[in-house]
Amino acid sequence: MKTKMSFGEALEVLKQGMQVYRSGWNGKNMFLFLKSSDALASDFGFGFGEYINEPVFGNIIFIKTADNKIHAWVPSQTDVLAEDWDIVS
């Protein structure tokens, strides 16, 4: 598999269900993963049309941090322009 990807290439890898990270990140064991809207709705017990005003979920990219927490992730300009993205093996 190709390593040292651009952010655009890393996004495509996320869409395929794999996890990615930047070799330039300081924290150990940090990586991104994509959770689909269908999976999120199912996790929260929605998506079946059972409730009035049932929320609609969108796809979300999450980060697993060095201190073992999961957060929604928003890229910095540095992340977007980086060419050091890699696939978690």
Swiss-Prot record:
Keywords: Metal-binding
Binding site for 3'cADPR: 25-26, 73, 79
Lineage: Viruses, Duplodnaviria, Heunggongvirae, Uroviricota, Caudoviricetes
Binding site for Mg(2+): 42
GO MF, one example: metal ion binding
Name by which UniProt lists this protein: Thoeris anti-defense 2
InterPro entries: Tad2-like_dom
Function per UniProt: Counteracts the host Thoeris antiviral defense system. Probably acts by binding and sequestering cyclic ADP-D-ribose signal molecules produced upon viral infection (3'cADPR or 2'cADPR); sequestration prevents the signal from activating the ThsA of the Thoeris antiviral defense system.
Assembly behavior: Homotetramer.
